[in-house]
Amino acid sequence: FKTGTPPRVDGRTVDFDELELQPGEGGGYRFGAYAQEDIPEQRPCWVTWAGDALKEVVRDNLDRSALYGGSIAGRGPRDCPSIEDKVVRFPDAPRHQVFLEPEGLHTEELYVNGLSTSLPAEVQLAFLRTLPGMKDVRMTKGGYAIEYDYFPPHQLRHTLELKDVPGLYFAGQVNGTTGYEEAAGQGVVAGINAALRVRGEDPFILERDQAYIGVLIDDLVTRGVDEPYRLFTSRAEFRLLLRQDNAHRRLGPLARERGLLTGVQTEALEQRIREEDRVAVWFRDTALRPEAVAGVLEEAGTRPISEPVRAVELLRRPRVSAAQLLEVGNADGVTASADALAAVEVEDNASTGHHAVRIVAE
């Protein structure tokens, strides 16, 4: 297979006044479900566009591209075409979107997403300087493409152990996948199983209805790959059950059973689940009076009620939030964190959907 990367540039040489600001969505998402981490302020991205001038530079130098000059012939990820591919395959496209992404919180270097290339460095600098806001840009690292070998993953068990070589585990690009998260997920599973094997314990296998990692590994070992594999929600038939908000419920108990959580993390997990269950019971069992919710329903633009209705049923109405219902109907002094309220909202909406009901039944 083949893969590539775009150039990096010095953000101090970019005129951001000519670019479109792309702020993050916020939300305070965390990698860990077991601690209240300090989340640093998110840095925005910026959008610029590759137009006719850039396409002309690329076309004039196609013979110098490793991808088009015959040096690299492997198959690359279909969803991440190089700028050479975009120019050749979509000649009538008036322009191509380019994102400038900060490489980190404490650096001025920007990742030029959308311009993966194998052209020489001087050509890359030439086409970068055709972009709006980048006429004086300084390139800090050039993009490049590589060709690599992989092991057909049907040779692996669901533990990522090689069938013919007990004790040898493969993870990442060597299995035919592409992407950071794909590699990291395999590394977690391979590492856990290698440790369990040394300890003589049962293997750790995630099913397709338990985790996206389970979908990824099952696809690899049962179907194999004929192109670099990237995981999408569309590959998961249980995707309504595999959500960010319930990851701790799906995977936390498994991690606890295998000794992957500290005592502090275990207590945090159990406390979070207890809180979510307590809030869910309140919404399920509490009937709200018409006069209590009249203002909330009017603000949401939905019809009023004439008799008490359970909070969980009102929550299914558009633009009605769990926080609003808890505030107006909370005679018992029930408190709830933002995470617990979000879990109630998403869980009810997802679990009552036709597709979710069907797949749970199956």
Please name every model-derived segment:
Residues F1-L100, G104:
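Rossmann-like dinucleotide-binding core of oxidoreductases
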Residues F1-D10, L131-P132, D136, V189-R197:
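Glycine-rich loop(s) and the adjacent beta-strand/alpha-helix scaffold that form part
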Residues K2, Y68-R75, M134-G142, E201-L206:
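Flexible, glycine/charged-enriched surface loops at secondary-structure junctions
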Residues R235, A247, G252-E362:
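Extended, charge-enriched "interface" segments that sit outside catalytic cores
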Residues V14-R30, R199-E299:
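Acidic/histidine-rich catalytic neighborhood
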Residues A183-L206:
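Internal hydrophobic alpha-helix adjacent to the cofactor/substrate pocket in enzyme cavities
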Residues Q173-E181, E237-R239:
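Glycine-rich phosphate/pyrophosphate-binding beta-alpha loops
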Residues F99, Y111-N175, I205-D218, A342-E362:
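A glycine-rich dinucleotide-binding beta-alpha-beta segment and adjacent secondary-structure elements
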